[in-house]
Structures are given as structure tokens and as C-alpha cells.
Curated annotation (Swiss-Prot):
Identification of the protein by name: Sulfate adenylyltransferase
Functional pathway: Sulfur metabolism; hydrogen sulfide biosynthesis; sulfite from sulfate: step 1/3
Organism listed in the record: Geobacillus sp. (strain WCH70)
An example Gene Ontology biological process: sulfate assimilation
Domain of life according to the entry: Bacteria
The entry's keywords: ATP-binding, Nucleotide-binding, Nucleotidyltransferase, Transferase
Enzyme nomenclature, EC number: 2.7.7.4
Disulfide bond positions: none
GO MF annotations, alphabetized: ATP binding; sulfate adenylyltransferase (ATP) activity
Pfam families the UniProt entry points to: ATP-sulfurylase (PF01747), PUA_2 (PF14306)
Reactions performed catalytically: sulfate + ATP + H(+) = adenosine 5'-phosphosulfate + diphosphate
UniProt key word NAD: no
Amino acid sequence: MSLSIPHGGTLIDRWNPSYPLDTLTKEIELTNAELSDLELIGTGAYSPLTGFLTKEDYDSVVETMRLTNGTVWSIPITLAVTEEKAKEISAGETAKLVYNGEVYGVIDIQEIYQPDKTKEALLVYKTDELKHPGVRKLFEKPNVYVGGPITLVKRTDKGRFAPFYFDPAETRKRFAELGWNTVVGFQTRNPVHRAHEYIQKCALEIVDGLFLNPLVGETKADDIPADIRMESYQVLLENYYPKDRVFLGVFQAAMRYAGPREAIFHAMVRKNFGCTHFIVGRDHAGVGDYYGTYDAQKIFLNFTPEELGITPLFFEHSFYCTKCEGMASTKTCPHDPKYHVVLSGTKVREMLRNGQVPPSTFSRPEVAAVLIKGLQQREAVTSSTR
């Protein structure tokens, strides 16, 4: 087995820093999430997409989780503009894509159309409730979409995360240099606690390497900030993982909280990065109680292994069992739940913010120390600026 073939067969490259911008007069302002999508399209992370979806592909993705050519794609990647802006631009024109006064790309406008946002919400997020963070963002966006291929002309400033940003072409090269033929991807927006460590190491028993690929794009306000999480990942890998079997790189996309649909999307993107396998745990990309615990695993049954092109690895909820004296899951542990050390993410965040160290059976002490220090420093800065 060798590294996965990019989704759709070819790794898309829409990067052209020499693109002639001088003649372009029209421009479209991007949101932070759209800017991330622009860069991920341009570097091939979203292969086979070459731009923001036109109406036919948009409708197909929303309704069938496929592009019009049949390729699996579960999340609509769209560019929204106001009705006023839509009147200023036309199909056939090329517009600059701007963020905070800087031009990051251009779009060859093929189509300007009005989406059915309620339908998009119900099919992609399984709800149209505005308290769902993904749905709320959807309805906060303007009501007109612009579709067409893009060209990426400028890269975003990666700041302190710069050493951990890798385009798909780079990760593929690194994996090959490490001698890895099989690579398992792990997506997270949370710190890695013992349960995550356990399933990652279970997966590492059957593949050559682990690609730990935390999301550092937009998340919910109560999620642990990315800079603090990154420090916690580094201390965990330094102390508890074999250095030649793990690769840490960030994923700059915004979190959609689309549960099952987002699990498919996350798998396809990791396939483009070179992964042959992808870990899907309980309630992947979920929020609240909108999705069933294992819906994100069941959704993979809608597709054949050939059209996915990446092997999903499904894991049950894991925990430390005081009776087993080790990490386990309901598949391997026969004991009553009273022997299981289980803490909710909300409870853990509360403990960390209060300076309380979660039990070592739940979180590595080095990781907890980094999280407590980071959160308390952030709280102190926030308090001083009020």
C-alpha cells in the first residue's frame, strides 16, 4: 500500500502569486472562514474543488453528498455576497477576493445564485435551529452565493503556527521521507486527553504513522483556544509518543459542527494530505445533542470503499477503568460504568479554568499543566483589558 491518491485523482494547485491584478476593478470581501476555504482550495486540500461551488454542484452536495460528477463531497463550500454586491458583479467577470484590505485571490465568476438556506441547514446540519453554531453562521451570511474557479495569489500570515502549516504536497513529501506507506489522520478541536491518546495508539498499532491534524480555524467561543491547545499537543507528543511515528500539522478550516457530514468532509481532506486511514470516534464534529453518538460512523456506509479512497477506523467511547487498571472501551471492558473515569468536555474546561488538575487517569499531568497555565494567563489578560 502507498499514500492515498488525492480525492478525484489529482491534487489541485491554484496558487499563482504572479497573477496580474492590475486590470481587475471588482472585488468581494471575504469572511475569515471564506479566507481559510480559499487557501485550502488553492493548495489542494479541498481537491477536487477548484473554486467555490456553482449552483448545480451546490444543490448536488446539499441533496446527495456528491458533486454533479458523482464524486463524494459532503459540505457545501460557498462564497456569500450581499444582494447589493451581487448587483455590482456579473457572470463572466473576474473579481478580487479581499480580506482586511489585502487581495488573497481572484474568482472567475461563473454563476450568481440564491441558495435555499433552510434546506441547506436541514440537510447539512440536520436542524434549522439558530442555537446550532453552524446554522447560526449560515443564516448570518449574506443571501447570495457566487460560484466559480479561484486563483490563490497571496498566502495568509500563519503567525506562531507557521512551523506547523503544511500544504498537502508538503505532507505527502514528509510522509514519504519518513518511509510511511500507511498514515492515519486524527482531527480534533480539543486538547488530547487519555481517551484520544488511547485510540490514536490503537490505530498506530496497524499503520506506519499518525498525522495529528488539529483544527485551528474558527471554533466556538468556549472551545480551548488554538495556541494553548498547540502547546498541549507538543508536550504530549514529546513525552508519550515515539518521535518517528507522529507528525503534527494544523488544519486551518473553520469548524462547521455538521457532525456526520463533517466527518466525511474531514476524511476526504485528510486523504488529500496523504492519509490512508482516518479515525472517527464518538460524536465526531458534533455539538449539543443534534446527532446520535455514532451517526458520524454510520454515514460512511452510504459510500463504497472505492469511492471514499480512505479507510475509516471507528472507535467507541474510551475511558480509564479502575477495575481493568487501564484504558478501555465498551468493546473491551466488561465492568460497570461506576468503575469508568469519564468527564465531560464542559466539566474539564471548568476544572482547568479553576486551576484544578483533572485526574491522571483522564489527562496527562503535563498536558493539564500547560492547559491550566495557558487558560489562567488568558483570563488574566482578559480581566486586565475589561
